[in-house]
Amino acid sequence: MRVTDIISCALLQASIALSTPVEELGAKAVVAKRFPPVPFLPGKASSVPGSRNKTCMLKALGGGKDDSANILSAVKQCNNGGHVVFPKGQQFTIGTALDLTFLNGIDLDIQGTIQFTNDTDYWQANSFKQVFQNATTFFQLGGKDINVYGGGTLDGNGQAWYDLYAKDIYILRPILFGLIGAKNAKISDLKFRYSPQWYTLVANSSQVVFSNIDIFGDSKSKNPAKNTDGWDTYRSDNIIIQNSNINNGDDCVSFKPNSTNILVQNLVCNGSHGISVGSLGQYPGEVDIVENILVRNISMSNASDGARIKVWPGASSALSGDLQGGGGSGAVRNVTYDGMIVKNVDYAIEITQCYGQKNLTLCNQFPSNLTISDITIKNFKGTTSKKYDPRVGYVVCSSPKVCSDISIENIDVKSPSGTNLFTCANAEGIQSQVNCTVEGDKGGHS
């Protein structure tokens, strides 16, 4: 079944009964938002959340004092059917790594601001180590039947990290929001600000919805905020990311290894590296699968890419000291990008099996062990930047044996000079679909 087949997914929210007198504390608990049924999702419907029958109202200590212990206590008290409120107008400080992977039937109603401390030494030593690309997280949130919402802000206090990374690219920079081992979780109506690295990691999770998330964070110094992906999914299934605004400096969304049955829709992305499959095939001996992905109705501005698939070649290569790899195996299959408006992007479409390898002759000698097949990219409109003018796209496979059934249709994208050329190689049938030029020397950027 193709990913574009409509499969209804009823996303029902809990009705919450509040039992504590929260009004006397000068704050108000808010019931979790309801989501309408969502078409297009190629996965299973979410299960019905349970009821909520108790409320824990937090009060910030203030003055930069660590609220972590009080937060942990409230979460434990209101777990299994409760509602934790971070009141509006209060700023909570987290200076201690929190393991919240025990959650069950709980609403985290973040109306105020949660800010993580900028103690880079502490966080490098104590943040939670994840298993992919040296990823770490400030906290781990997991379990089942979880709602996180409220209109508030999570602030990663990233400036100290941007400046430190400029001096040492091997530091471990925490991810702002770590959803680890979650099932039936809904995260909505929140602002994510100034993450040290990726904004969101969704790992080993299923039946998850992100909706109405506003992401923003830039650097106030000469040192840019790098690797600030909006979302990265990893070993996760049945995920929705929708109705959000993202201003960042790396992938708007990235499907990392073993991401399946994912719907991404109605996003406005600015300053990113596109909506990306990968990178994949980075680690020898690992099998990476990304399949059944639908990306639809996207606005992409001032970005390196619109739609992007990036796969490492069969031999080791390096983009930088902290990003190198190649030789892994697996497959990318049944991926559809349908509907994207692009403005000032370097490439509207980029598919490469030579990621990290600028010498394409060497890449062709050691083709990727990871296959790309059944890819549909259609209904794109807009303009590219001057960077690769006169080209607007790049489709370069390492061998026709590992790259097949790529369909590109209804692409109305022009370069500044008015052309619509693609660099093409080793992709059977692509010459009849787009205006191909000779093979270039680009092996993929970070």
Swiss-Prot record:
<feature type="glycosylation site" description="N-linked (GlcNAc...) asparagine">
    <location>
        <position position="134"/>
    </location>
</feature>
<dbReference type="InterPro" id="IPR011050">
    <property type="entry name" value="Pectin_lyase_fold/virulence"/>
</dbReference>
<feature type="disulfide bond">
    <location>
        <begin position="397"/>
        <end position="403"/>
    </location>
</feature>
<dbReference type="GO" id="GO:0047911">
    <property type="term" value="F:galacturan 1,4-alpha-galacturonidase activity"/>
</dbReference>
<keyword id="KW-0325">Glycoprotein</keyword>
<keyword id="KW-0378">Hydrolase</keyword>
<keyword id="KW-0964">Secreted</keyword>
<feature type="active site">
    <location>
        <position position="273"/>
    </location>
</feature>
<dbReference type="GO" id="GO:0005576">
    <property type="term" value="C:extracellular region"/>
</dbReference>
<feature type="glycosylation site" description="N-linked (GlcNAc...) asparagine">
    <location>
        <position position="270"/>
    </location>
</feature>
<keyword id="KW-0732">Signal</keyword>
<feature type="glycosylation site" description="N-linked (GlcNAc...) asparagine">
    <location>
        <position position="435"/>
    </location>
</feature>
<feature type="repeat" description="PbH1 6">
    <location>
        <begin position="403"/>
        <end position="434"/>
    </location>
</feature>
<keyword id="KW-0677">Repeat</keyword>
<dbReference type="InterPro" id="IPR012334">
    <property type="entry name" value="Pectin_lyas_fold"/>
</dbReference>
<dbReference type="GO" id="GO:0045490">
    <property type="term" value="P:pectin catabolic process"/>
</dbReference>
<keyword id="KW-1015">Disulfide bond</keyword>
<feature type="repeat" description="PbH1 2">
    <location>
        <begin position="259"/>
        <end position="279"/>
    </location>
</feature>
<feature type="disulfide bond">
    <location>
        <begin position="424"/>
        <end position="436"/>
    </location>
</feature>
<feature type="glycosylation site" description="N-linked (GlcNAc...) asparagine">
    <location>
        <position position="302"/>
    </location>
</feature>
<dbReference type="GO" id="GO:0004650">
    <property type="term" value="F:polygalacturonase activity"/>
</dbReference>
<feature type="glycosylation site" description="N-linked (GlcNAc...) asparagine">
    <location>
        <position position="359"/>
    </location>
</feature>
<dbReference type="GO" id="GO:0071555">
    <property type="term" value="P:cell wall organization"/>
</dbReference>
<dbReference type="Pfam" id="PF00295">
    <property type="entry name" value="Glyco_hydro_28"/>
</dbReference>
<protein>
    <recommendedName>
        <fullName>Exopolygalacturonase</fullName>
        <ecNumber>3.2.1.67</ecNumber>
    </recommendedName>
</protein>
<feature type="repeat" description="PbH1 3">
    <location>
        <begin position="290"/>
        <end position="311"/>
    </location>
</feature>
<feature type="signal peptide">
    <location>
        <begin position="1"/>
        <end position="17"/>
    </location>
</feature>
<comment type="similarity">
    <text>Belongs to the glycosyl hydrolase 28 family.</text>
</comment>
<feature type="glycosylation site" description="N-linked (GlcNAc...) asparagine">
    <location>
        <position position="258"/>
    </location>
</feature>
<feature type="glycosylation site" description="N-linked (GlcNAc...) asparagine">
    <location>
        <position position="204"/>
    </location>
</feature>
<feature type="repeat" description="PbH1 4">
    <location>
        <begin position="332"/>
        <end position="353"/>
    </location>
</feature>
<feature type="active site" description="Proton donor">
    <location>
        <position position="250"/>
    </location>
</feature>
<feature type="glycosylation site" description="N-linked (GlcNAc...) asparagine">
    <location>
        <position position="369"/>
    </location>
</feature>
<keyword id="KW-0326">Glycosidase</keyword>
<feature type="glycosylation site" description="N-linked (GlcNAc...) asparagine">
    <location>
        <position position="334"/>
    </location>
</feature>
<dbReference type="InterPro" id="IPR000743">
    <property type="entry name" value="Glyco_hydro_28"/>
</dbReference>
<feature type="glycosylation site" description="N-linked (GlcNAc...) asparagine">
    <location>
        <position position="118"/>
    </location>
</feature>
<dbReference type="InterPro" id="IPR006626">
    <property type="entry name" value="PbH1"/>
</dbReference>
<feature type="repeat" description="PbH1 1">
    <location>
        <begin position="236"/>
        <end position="257"/>
    </location>
</feature>
<comment type="function">
    <text>Hydrolysis of 1,4-alpha-D-galactosiduronic linkages in pectate and other galacturonans.</text>
</comment>
<feature type="glycosylation site" description="N-linked (GlcNAc...) asparagine">
    <location>
        <position position="53"/>
    </location>
</feature>
<keyword id="KW-0961">Cell wall biogenesis/degradation</keyword>
